[in-house]
Curated annotation (Swiss-Prot):
InterPro entries: T_IF-3_C_sf, T_IF-3_N_sf, Translation_initiation_fac3_CS, Translation_initiation_fac_3, Translation_initiation_fac_3_C, Translation_initiation_fac_3_N. It comes from the Bacteria. IF-3 binds to the 30S ribosomal subunit and shifts the equilibrium between 70S ribosomes and their 50S and 30S subunits in favor of the free subunits, thus enhancing the availability of 30S subunits on which protein synthesis initiation begins. The gene is infC. The lineage of its organism: Bacteria, Pseudomonadati, Pseudomonadota, Gammaproteobacteria, Enterobacterales. GO terms for molecular function: ribosome binding; translation initiation factor activity. This is Translation initiation factor IF-3. It holds the Pfam family IF3_N. Belongs to the IF-3 family. Keywords: Cytoplasm, Initiation factor, Protein biosynthesis. Monomer. It comes from Klebsiella pneumoniae. The keyword Protein biosynthesis applies. GO terms for biological process: ribosome disassembly. The keyword ATP-binding does not apply. The record marks 107, 110 as: Important for 30S binding.
Length: 180
């Protein structure tokens, strides 16, 4: 439906005429304390300054109100929450698969990928899969995992190291070391 009336969402803070208290603890534009005043007087001071009276903490006794530009306040609040979201890093678990017979060239390529994952701050899951008769040579698989662990000792901490084989595979999990 085009052109319909929009439902106004409830504001997180009451402003101006929406404030219900008789007296409020007033804070000025610069954050200075102006004391406890009547609601009417507080609204007059806000109108003189050409801004809004915003109820900051309604549960206080008396409620704390501040003289400020409400639009600017909401903008700053949303901007700071976006900044916080941007700073949060979602840690992913990247997986690299090895085989007991992985040759040197392939090993180096996979090792470079592991280094890149760890430097980006992601965890790395190394899966060593056995096929057919390779199951008889599980110690070769352990040697491969130990070699990976030794090659990445500078960058990573082992979170989970396999003590026994699970099905036809061994799994090792590495986490990046915390930067000092």
């Amino acid at each position: 439906m085009k052109g319909g009336k929009r439902v106004q969402t409830a504001r997180p803070n009451r402003i101006n005429g929406e404030i219900r208290a008789q007296e409020v603890r007033l804070t000025g534009l610069e954050g200075e304390q102006l004391g406890i005043v009547s609601l009417r007087e507080a609204i007059e001071k806000a109108e003189e300054a050409g801004v809004d009276l915003v109820e900051i903490s309604p549960n206080a006794e008396p409620p704390v109100c501040r003289i400020m530009d409400y639009g600017k306040f909401l903008y700053e609040k949303s901007k700071s929450s976006k900044e916080q979201k941007k700073k949060q890093k979602v840690i992913q678990v990247k997986e690299i698969k090895f085989r007991p017979g992985t040759d040197e060239g392939d090993y180096q390529v996979k090792l470079r990928s592991l280094i890149r994952f760890l430097e980006d701050g992601d965890k790395a899951k190394i899966t060593l899969r056995f096929r057919g008769r390779e199951m008889a040579h599980q110690q070769i698989g352990m040697e491969v995992l130990n070699r990976v662990k030794d090659d990445l000792v500078e960058l990573a901490v082992v979170e989970a190291f396999p003590t026994k084989i699970e099905g036809r595979q061994m799994i090792m999990v590495l986490a990046p070391k915390k930067k000092q």
